[in-house]
Amino acid sequence: MEQKDVLKALQRDHAAELKLAAERLKGTARHTEIIPSPVLSEMTGHEILLKPENLQVTGSFKIRGAYNKIASLTEEQIAHGIVTASAGNHAQGVAYAARER
């Protein structure tokens, strides 16, 4: 990555991008609670909290990125097709997002 590309990335409005992504994901990604893990907390001597993203419709957090990207594409971009290289959670997220679009 060239220095100009790094500077451009640093100047982006990440807060606005996050708000837009959250808007796109409304009604898609499930809200998962943060839950304590007494067993892991006892084992480590520290409070351990878990976010069970395995409860998402695709079984992982990957639905968030895949859905957000596909939802951001124009009709022209969609017409060219969607390709992913994954045999796992990302592929499931892409397939789900493409079907829902």
Segment roles from a protein language model:
Residues M1-R101:
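PLP-dependent amino-acid enzyme catalytic core
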